[in-house]
């Protein structure tokens, strides 16, 4: 039985650090249809599978509410604790080296007062999603975030405080762990229309740290968007939901941010704020 099938029940939310307070958020991981098979960082290009990471996930995949993606359409699924690194928690080589889109999904039970009190502001906070994430709540595109090291959040009150009032909330997160040459990513890229099949390119002059090449092969012998990622750093690229997910509430008037201004008195060296 897949995680998608077992996840259809109503989970009980207990104490812990996972989504909604559960010790381990039950998720389903989609590792086939939305990406490529994993290839070794040192495997020759000629043996690599087609790889491509669109900057925006094709919306045709989610024209219907996300529960419709379960079952036959979801592909292979596994239970995954949150927070954790999906590619470091198992023992399989394929999962450990997977690079592309993966899917998390969890259904949670809403507190009745959250639904009925229109003055309650409900926020979904994601501590870390490495590296590029798109979040849906009840099938609605809610928030996107790029950069896997900082938290982000979204006010989701309007998504369920409407008639008919739902009793459950379906949270779906698509994460892509490809490290691309964008400014906030790590590593340069190489574009060459004349590369020979089987070529592995060395790192460039490393404008960012850590250095590694993302090699795009746009020649006629490759599918559109084909690339090979060769990691040359000496640590593992942990990916997935690396920190906890939280649902919390605030009143309509709330503190959004705090700025502390400090200074030093020149005559005494005394600090103040």
Curated annotation (Swiss-Prot):
SUPFAM superfamilies: Galactose-binding domain-like (SSF49785)
An example molecular function term from Gene Ontology annotations: hydrolase activity, hydrolyzing O-glycosyl compounds
InterPro entries in UniProt: Galactose-bd-like_sf, Glyco_hydro_2_N
GO biological process: carbohydrate metabolic process
Chain positions covered by the region annotation Disordered: 1-20
Family to which the UniProt record says this protein belongs: Belongs to the glycosyl hydrolase 2 family.
PANTHER family: BETA-GLUCURONIDASE
Protein's UniProt name: Putative inactive beta-glucuronidase protein GUSBP11
Organism (species): Homo sapiens
